[in-house]
């Protein structure tokens, strides 16, 4: 039997009602998506406030965020550069799929049409700046990733004229009580309804091909590696 000793604050007990496959399929992506939603709700986000937009929608964090938000009663808009995945995104719970190509990111206004009560951003850069300019008053953005850029060129207008909140989601430094609560909810009211559909199981020897797909931007959802296959 193989084992490794790690510091106690690195690990969280698997919650009751969750199996090993679900825990690995959720992984850091699922935890991060759920943490973002928990923090947004703590900041006042509720389904009645308006729709939530999710960028990087076909990725692991985006896919799980769409599924969980939909299950919690939110109207979800999926923002993607992969228009051919619209069917997949709607199956996860997106009420609308918006093409990233439809945005004119070269002319981002300090304030644009207010559209979103919440936003989960996996891209950074111009998309995050556009999101900030299009939030409803009192809206909340969860900044998770930098798949497009780690830079952010925006104005203070959304924050001081619409009261928009920008939350940074750091999944690696969450206090243990909050980590336990997030995982508890992932096994309960925030359990994704389509985890199996968004997850592929691969043998270890298949990983090089999967990595190639990731580098080409062709991957979607989650991958679980079966070391026994």
Question: Where do the PLM segments sit?
Answer:
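Structured surface patches comprising rigid loops and adjacent beta-strands/short helices at the edges
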Residues: 5-13, 17
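Mid-domain Rossmann-like dinucleotide-binding core that forms the NAD(H)/NADP(H) cofactor-binding site
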Residues: 24-100
């Amino acid at each position: 039997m193989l084992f490794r000793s790690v510091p106690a604050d690195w690990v969280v007990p698997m919650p009751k009602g969750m199996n090993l496959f679900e825990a690995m399929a959720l992984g850091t992506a699922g935890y991060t998506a759920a943490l973002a939603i928990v923090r947004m709700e703590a900041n006042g986000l509720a389904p009645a406030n308006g729709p939530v937009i999710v960028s990087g929608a076909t990725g692991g964090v985006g896919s799980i965020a769409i599924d969980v938000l939909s299950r919690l009663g939110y109207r979800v808009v999926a923002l993607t550069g992969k228009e051919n995945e619209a069917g997949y995104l709607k199956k996860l719970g997106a009420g609308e799929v918006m093409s990233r190509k439809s945005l004119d990111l070269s002319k981002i206004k300090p304030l644009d049409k207010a559209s979103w009560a919440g936003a989960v951003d996996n891209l950074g850069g111009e998309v995050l700046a556009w999101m900030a300019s299009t939030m409803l008053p009192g809206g909340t953005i969860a900044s998770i990733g930098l798949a497009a850029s780690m830079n952010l060129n925006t104005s203070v207008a959304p924050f001081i004229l619409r009261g928009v909140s920008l939350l940074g989601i750091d999944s690696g430094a969450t206090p243990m009580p909050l980590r336990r609560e997030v995982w508890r909810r992932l096994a309960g009211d925030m359990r994704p309804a389509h985890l199996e559909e968004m997850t592929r199981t691969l043998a270890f020897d298949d990983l090089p091909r999967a990595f190639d797909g990731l580098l080409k931007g062709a991957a979607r959802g989650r991958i679980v590696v079966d070391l026994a296959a």
